[in-house]
Amino acid sequence: MNKCAIILAAGQGTRIKSKLPKVLHKACGKEMVNHVIDAMRNAEIDDVNVIIGKGAELVKERTTSKNVSYSLQAEQLGTGHAVKCAKDFLEGKTGVVAIFTGDAPLIKAETVKNLVDTHINEKNSATLLTSVIENPTGYGRIVRNGESVEKIVEHKDCNEQEIKIQEVNAGMYCFDIESLLTSLEQLSNDNAQGEYYLTDVIEILKKDNKKVGAMITDFEETLGVNSRAELAKVESIMRNRINRTHLDNGVTIIDPLNTYIEPEVVIGKDTIIYPGNVIEGKTVIGEDCILYPNSRINNSTIGNGVEIQSSVILDSKIGDETTVGPFAYVRPESNIGEHVRIGDFVEIKKSTIGNNTKVSHLTYIGDAEVGERCNFGCGTVVVNYDGKKKHKTIIGDDSFIGCNTNLVSPVEVKDNTYIAAGSTITKEVPEGSLAIARAKQQNIEGWVERKKLK
């Protein structure tokens, strides 16, 4: 059966008090609406339409990589009106449509799939996603007749029996497309708000003797975000969910409450993560690593057995058994080999570092290719920028760079070379050479006494 989805994402969200449309606020590094789109895709629904309104162009810009279509709701006149705006998307289609809100990022793909499967298997015209909660105050109650849903009653309209019902409407649905389109034509805005409500479609379907069902899910999954406090709550639940998955997969997270891991991160078993670490984007971390406190790793690949201490690694690759930090900065497009030492206050930018090389402290390497088994003394600087352009430096295998050396790019240091401490290298250093580029030391005897500095 054909399946499609509509995501309601047109509202500004005034209570969140932001210039940014509400659905573009991020939960664990990803826009809320993109969490929902991904849930649809992972539930095997590829045909997704996003209802846009406030900040429409920005929402399109932030979701364009998701390959979705859009319908414009120029005026926000209720959820029913939002779906009416997707009429062109729905017309000509057969099968079922799932309708979800773009501000509920905790929804799981398996829940979406189960809702659609339940709808199809029970041959319903509409199937509601519902939850059972202890305190349903403020929520629309689900009134059932056996397994079938009779109606949704808003809290303020409940009678004595209905007020006791704990099953509530989550505001997420699956509809038979033909039945939905027919019902939308009958929707009225004859109410105090002058809006069209999607919940009224249920009443219309029941009057037409159509079958309406419901599927209960965990209330946490259905939480919507209307304020910064609710966003923080949702993100806390999501972080806990992510961390629990890694724990269950054999990763040690010493303090999950103080560890931030985004949803697309992959971590190998027997890796240990100390508090204060931030792991973002599509980072992949191997097995048997140790992440000591307070590092940030973004969109990077970390090999097996790597140790990282209080450092920042961005868009780079770190090889097996390498150590990084403390206080190292590995900038984008760097490729660090295996068994490498990147020590304290070392900055690597857009460079390749060969296996078994040591860059132990207070060094800057930018736009360079460094061979294997090299050693960098303290205070080495690759001078890669002339004020207009960046230039490349090449350092061969088995080279020894003495302390306080300046390598002025573009320059090449061949294999098996030594550079004396304090040198400023501006020309090629031949293989097997010792390069010395510094002023000759001169001692002036009696100078201090003559100047009466003592």
Curated annotation (Swiss-Prot):
Positions bound to Mg(2+): D103, N226
Positions bound to acetyl-CoA: N384, Y385, A421, R438
Reported cofactor(s): Mg(2+)
Transmembrane residue ranges: none
Residue span of region Pyrophosphorylase: 1-228
GO biological process: cell morphogenesis; cell wall organization; lipid A biosynthetic process; peptidoglycan biosynthetic process; regulation of cell shape; UDP-N-acetylglucosamine biosynthetic process
Entry keyword Nucleotide-binding: no
UniProt EC number: 2.7.7.23, 2.3.1.157
Keywords: Acyltransferase, Cell shape, Cell wall biogenesis/degradation, Cytoplasm, Magnesium, Metal-binding, Multifunctional enzyme, Nucleotidyltransferase, Peptidoglycan synthesis, Repeat, Transferase
Leading EC class: transferase
Subcellular location: Cytoplasm
Highest taxon of the lineage: Bacteria
Annotated spans, N-acetyltransferase: 250-454
Reactions mediated catalytically: alpha-D-glucosamine 1-phosphate + acetyl-CoA = N-acetyl-alpha-D-glucosamine 1-phosphate + CoA + H(+); N-acetyl-alpha-D-glucosamine 1-phosphate + UTP + H(+) = UDP-N-acetyl-alpha-D-glucosamine + diphosphate
Residues reported in the UniProt entry to bind UDP-N-acetyl-alpha-D-glucosamine: 8-11, 22, 73, 78-79, 140, 154, 169, 226, 331, 349, 364, 375
Cofactor: binding details: Binds 1 Mg(2+) ion per subunit.
Region annotated Linker, chain positions: 229-249
Function, as annotated: Catalyzes the last two sequential reactions in the de novo biosynthetic pathway for UDP-N-acetylglucosamine (UDP-GlcNAc). The C-terminal domain catalyzes the transfer of acetyl group from acetyl coenzyme A to glucosamine-1-phosphate (GlcN-1-P) to produce N-acetylglucosamine-1-phosphate (GlcNAc-1-P), which is converted into UDP-GlcNAc by the transfer of uridine 5-monophosphate (from uridine 5-triphosphate), a reaction catalyzed by the N-terminal domain.
Record family assignment: In the N-terminal section; belongs to the N-acetylglucosamine-1-phosphate uridyltransferase family. In the C-terminal section; belongs to the transferase hexapeptide repeat family.
NCBIfam families the UniProt entry points to: glmU (TIGR01173), PRK14354.1 (NF010934)
Protein's name in the database: Bifunctional protein GlmU
Species the sequence originates in: Clostridium perfringens (strain SM101 / Type A)
Underlying gene: glmU
